[in-house]
Amino acid sequence: MPLLDSFTVDHTRMNAPAVRVAKTMQTPKGDTITVFDLRFTAPNKDILSEKGIHTLEHLYAGFMRNHLNGDSVEIIDISPMGCRTGFYMSLIGTPSEQQVADAWIAAMEDVLKVESQNKIPELNEYQCGTAAMHSLKEAQQIAKNILDAGVSVNKNDELALPESMLKELRID
């Protein structure tokens, strides 16, 4: 099985909160798709709460679109990581890490402005697969933590695992 790009970087050296360009690719028509690793917590040290990350999933995608979409950028999807340390964001375009970080900060400020649980988009059994698993309070605590810490940039060349280590860690 081919090694996924996200597993070629050293998770023990990742800063968080931080933005990282996880992958770029060209479509057959020439558009650039960029995938960003939006790392909220340090891997293997902390995880986002189940209800908090789920509520953020509902809020964050819309708020990020409000702050990042434009003539040269269109967000395709923002999805939580299975390890619950952040989100992956796929988009058309090539915004800088700083543009993404600025949008992320603005989105976290928006999360803090949500006044009540009933203001969470699509929080109902028709549009959400686990409508009971939400906590605005936990999502707002995550947002506050991001705002308090600030958002830095993780660079792939600084995090790359050596080829010898990738071979050593490989399971056939």
UniProtKB/Swiss-Prot annotation:
GO terms for biological process: quorum sensing. Pfam families: LuxS (PF02664). Binds 1 Fe cation per subunit. The keyword Metal-binding applies. Signal peptide: none annotated. It catalyses: S-(5-deoxy-D-ribos-5-yl)-L-homocysteine = (S)-4,5-dihydroxypentane-2,3-dione + L-homocysteine. InterPro entries: LuxS_sf, Metalloenz_LuxS/M16, S-ribosylhomocysteinase. It comes from the Bacteria. The keyword Coiled coil does not apply. Keywords: Autoinducer synthesis, Iron, Lyase, Metal-binding, Quorum sensing. GO terms for molecular function: iron ion binding; S-ribosylhomocysteine lyase activity. Gene3D superfamilies: S-ribosylhomocysteinase (LuxS) (3.30.1360.80). Its EC number is 4.4.1.21. Homodimer. Belongs to the LuxS family. Involved in the synthesis of autoinducer 2 (AI-2) which is secreted by bacteria and is used to communicate both the cell density and the metabolic potential of the environment. The regulation of gene expression in response to changes in cell density is called quorum sensing. Catalyzes the transformation of S-ribosylhomocysteine (RHC) to homocysteine (HC) and 4,5-dihydroxy-2,3-pentadione (DPD). This is S-ribosylhomocysteine lyase.
